[in-house]
Amino acid sequence: VEWTDAERSAILSLWGKIDTDELGPALLARLXLVXXXTQRYF
């Protein structure tokens, strides 16, 4: 994928706003709950 400078800037800006310490465990828990039902699609 070739990202433009504007796209890179937007992505970095969004990632800067995410609190990974707070959201990380919640996202992993959701992944563990959904993975069994969607495993065959990946």
Swiss-Prot record:
Gene3D superfamilies: Globins. Residues 2-42 form the Globin domain. Keywords: Heme, Iron, Metal-binding, Oxygen transport, Transport. One of its GO terms (molecular function) is oxygen binding. Red blood cells. InterPro entries: Globin, Globin-like_sf, Globin/Proto. Heterotetramer of two alpha chains and two beta chains. This fish has ten hemoglobins, 8 of which are anodal and 2 cathodal. The cathodal tetramers do not exhibit the Bohr effect, due to lack of the C-terminal His in the beta chains and to blocking of the alpha-amino group on the N-terminal residue of the alpha chains. The possession of both anodal and cathodal hemoglobins may be a physiological advantage for fish living in fast-moving water habitats. Involved in oxygen transport from gills to the various peripheral tissues. Belongs to the globin family. This is Hemoglobin subunit beta-A. It comes from Catostomus clarkii. The gene is hbba.
